[in-house]
């Protein structure tokens, strides 16, 4: 897989946003937390991830390029809040009351757990499975575990083991 090149202006916008919210947090909390490392290696449908111990934020380059400023405005403070909560409170629920407080009271942004960006360009192929009551879509990773006999999946509604039917077209 080739690496996407993020334009310098977009990287600068990410860092400007990050620094703005970090400054807000440091002023509000009376702290001097350092600037986290930022990279653009997040894959799949996740917009970003916060790596707590390494104080690092990973951003999805495809979703960033497709959504630009809305991505920056939503995802950067979301992931920064995870890092700040970990530094301030230790290990707590990922989107718990501490995280919501950090988002709303400290960073002054809405506390949204998930993004609403279009993910068709980053979604992987899925595989159709069936139970007694409905059809399910499994990712390639889960499908391969079934094929290798490493896992089996059951319906949360009826409890029946899922049976493979077809591959979903892209």
From Swiss-Prot:
One Pfam family from the record: SprT-like
Localization, UniProt: Cytoplasm
Annotated Zn(2+) binding sites: 78, 82
Keyword annotations of the record: Cytoplasm, Metal-binding, Zinc
One GO molecular-function entry: zinc ion binding
Transmembrane portions of the chain: none
This protein's record includes keyword Kinase: no
Domain of life: Bacteria
SprT-like domain location: 22-165
GO cellular component: cytoplasm
The keyword Phosphoprotein is annotated on this UniProt entry: no
Catalytic-site annotation from UniProt: 79
Major location (coarse): cytoplasm
Cofactor: Zn(2+)
Protein name as catalogued: Protein SprT
